[in-house]
């Protein structure tokens, strides 16, 4: 038996097919992964993401600590609640984890990290924190739901009080706010508008049930994966890991090399990698029959690469993928499938946003 979120029984009751996900018993789907995918693109779906790890960082050196620990620069965050996508790197510039950090004040931040890397992340955070005047606290007293889709604002309005909804009405993307016992952020992993809602664990099931009563579709890990891949969002362990730098994972935009005098873990290795040149993560589109899959070989101008994530796209009706390839890549490539070379188009990662193709 794996670890269970506070919603385990609710998932079983809702007919979920449960699977092991990095030691957690999590719902893969509730009957139809494709229907759940379409619900998020066209209406609204809710995911239990309580397996994610929330870490609060406080202390007089909180900002200095995070400026050293993380590749992006938290000093850029000036507005209370503002979120930033970033990563923790090792000395070789490899990605220990990608995460979101929220700014409350220069002495208080919140990080949300992946469940698959939880133990390693927490050990790394504590090790680095030992040299700073900070405290780090895992918030395992909280659960988290992701409410995603074009109708997310309507649905959340129906389960909050008028006063609570007024607090978040019109909130810009990538911002979080304390609303009573909840922490509500305009973030997500689907390419749709929506919210991630951090809730005291004992209140989680009531909120889940209220959302299901409001005709929000419960969604599992299967739809979460096809949605994030359509949106061109990385999955840790597939699209990058501790042996891959952000520069090779289409995450260069989340590394702050300026100001030049800020030292952060992995900086020197990244600067060297930048100077030497490196592979890049691209999107692939195949409108022929067949499905692009993780691990397939990609042939491009000047070399070979590999598909890191691939799937049939329910929104587009054909197969899409992300692949790490030599930087010499042109507009087309070939993927080896069943001993045949299939032609594919090379595009920027990201295929669907707000329900529409961006190809």
From Swiss-Prot:
This is Aminomethyltransferase. Its EC number is 2.1.2.10. Keywords: Aminotransferase, Transferase. It comes from Idiomarina loihiensis (strain ATCC BAA-735 / DSM 15497 / L2-TR). Disulfide bonds: none annotated. InterPro entries: GCS_T, GCS_T_bac, GCST_C, GCV_T_N, GcvT/YgfZ/DmdA, GcvT/YgfZ_C, TrmE/GcvT_dom1. It catalyses: N(6)-[(R)-S(8)-aminomethyldihydrolipoyl]-L-lysyl-[protein] + (6S)-5,6,7,8-tetrahydrofolate = N(6)-[(R)-dihydrolipoyl]-L-lysyl-[protein] + (6R)-5,10-methylene-5,6,7,8-tetrahydrofolate + NH4(+). The lineage of its organism: Bacteria, Pseudomonadati, Pseudomonadota, Gammaproteobacteria, Alteromonadales. The glycine cleavage system catalyzes the degradation of glycine. It comes from the Bacteria. The glycine cleavage system is composed of four proteins: P, T, L and H. Belongs to the GcvT family.
């Amino acid at each position: 038996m794996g670890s269970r979120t506070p919603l385990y029984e609710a998932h079983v009751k809702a007919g979920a097919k449960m699977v092991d996900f990095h030691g957690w018993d999590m719902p893969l789907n509730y009957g139809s992964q494709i229907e759940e995918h379409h619900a998020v693109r066209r209406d609204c779906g809710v995911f239990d993401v309580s397996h994610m790890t929330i870490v609060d960082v406080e202390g007089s050196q909180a900002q200095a600590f995070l400026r050293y620990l993380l590749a992006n620069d938290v000093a850029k965050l000036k507005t209370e609640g503002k979120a930033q996508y970033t990563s923790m790197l090792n000395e070789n510039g490899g990605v220990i984890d990608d995460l979101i950090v929220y700014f409350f004040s220069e002495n208080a931040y919140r990080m949300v990290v992946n469940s698959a890397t939880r133990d390693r992340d927490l050990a790394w955070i504590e090790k680095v924190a030992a040299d700073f005047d900070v405290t780090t606290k895992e918030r395992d007293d909280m659960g988290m739901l992701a409410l995603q889709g074009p109708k997310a604002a309507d649905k959340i309005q129906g389960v909050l009080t008028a006063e609570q909804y007024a607090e978040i009405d019109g909130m810009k993307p990538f911002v979080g706010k304390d609303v009573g016992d909840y922490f509500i952020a305009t973030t997500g992993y689907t390419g749709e508008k929506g919210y991630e809602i951090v809730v005291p664990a004992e209140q989680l099931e009531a909120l889940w049930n209220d959302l299901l009563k409001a005709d929000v579709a419960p969604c599992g890990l299967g739809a979460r994966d096809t949605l994030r891949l359509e949106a061109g969002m990385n999955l840790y362990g597939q699209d990058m890991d501790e042996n891959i730098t952000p520069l090779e994972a289409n995450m260069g935009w989340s590394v702050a090399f300026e100001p030049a005098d800020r030292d952060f873990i992995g900086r020197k290795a990244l600067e060297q990698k930048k100077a030497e040149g490196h592979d890049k993560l691209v999107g692939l589109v195949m409108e022929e029959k067949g499905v692009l899959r993780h691990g397939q070989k990609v042939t491009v101008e000047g070399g070979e690469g590999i598909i890191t994530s691939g799937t049939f796209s329910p929104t587009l009706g054909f197969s899409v993928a992300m692949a790490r390839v030599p930087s010499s890549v042109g507009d087309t490539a070939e993927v080896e499938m069943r001993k045949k070379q299939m032609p594919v188009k090379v595009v920027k990662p990201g295929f669907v946003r707000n329900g529409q193709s961006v190809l």
